[in-house]
């Protein structure tokens, strides 16, 4: 889960990372009141989970509370790269002397963590990495020790901080690691990390991504979800403990096991090239418990996507036998009733496959077509989706 800037700021503050005052506002009046409370120069910042706010006009400096009101009025409701601005953060103005960059993230390729740091912050890090890679220090971080004092000193030294700043910057970096570790984050980024005119080191703009798989031990994270920006289908799937990701195609996909589902997406995409370019509409892994309720919930999510024209159910029976899956499909269609209106292509293989096929054949549901192989099923589902278009 990606956080808004104000949420990242609040997490930073909770872990002792030095930040400036910031108050979230959802109306121009709230923005004015926040600016009056903070006092002095403030910055009105659109709260969206996408970059490029400044270029889009979503970040404005306000010298007075009245200016903050006018800026908030202009920014609220703005569309920034497809994201509607529902709230702004009124941030205390900073006397910036220098801008730096710091982030810590998962390094999946090397199965560790990676800290990245530069004395050249404030710009897009991708641009810096491409144009001047030598200006971006990359330091592996051990999962056993994390960013301790020694590692923090190594980071600031490799980044090229002057000797007189290293202790202060290293201290902030250790606190940012605490955010990363204690909050089960997959990314903590500060751009810019700044030195103010009086020599203080502050985290001015933060980005945090949290690991959804750690929600069971992070009770406070549920309150950070903004339901206004959640995809309703993904929210419904999550509520039913389904692993679902919406894509932009026309063939709904249900499978058991992430590996099988990903393979199914590839096969559907390949088959779609022969049928008008149709593509997979989603990733949906029902796991090992493909009973009637789970199957009904899965179908309910997929059939709620208006883009879906057909559904391909691809199941390999293992612990959950194919006859149980078949019974689940039949009962799921009974549960959904008139809500089930799109054709289903079902491919079963593995444990109790013959019994599973027999159950579906005897049910003789008009929406269900049996396929002997994954390739055959993907081709038929793609054909049906193309025909429906």
Swiss-Prot record:
Keywords on record: ATP-binding, Ligase, Magnesium, Metal-binding, Nucleotide-binding, Tricarboxylic acid cycle
Cofactor binding note from Swiss-Prot or TrEMBL: Binds 1 Mg(2+) ion per subunit.
Domain annotation ATP-grasp: ranges: 9-236
Quaternary structure, from the entry: Heterotetramer of two alpha and two beta subunits.
Described purpose of this protein according to its UniProt entry: Succinyl-CoA synthetase functions in the citric acid cycle (TCA), coupling the hydrolysis of succinyl-CoA to the synthesis of either ATP or GTP and thus represents the only step of substrate-level phosphorylation in the TCA. The beta subunit provides nucleotide specificity of the enzyme and binds the substrate succinate, while the binding sites for coenzyme A and phosphate are found in the alpha subunit.
A molecular-function term among this protein's GO annotations: ATP binding
GO CC annotation terms, alphabetical: cytosol; succinate-CoA ligase complex
Protein name per UniProt: Succinate--CoA ligase [ADP-forming] subunit beta
Residues annotated to bind ATP: 45, 52-54, 94, 99
Signal peptide (from-to): none
Cofactors (names): Mg(2+)
Organism name: Micrococcus luteus (strain ATCC 4698 / DSM 20030 / JCM 1464 / CCM 169 / CCUG 5858 / IAM 1056 / NBRC 3333 / NCIMB 9278 / NCTC 2665 / VKM Ac-2230) (Micrococcus lysodeikticus)
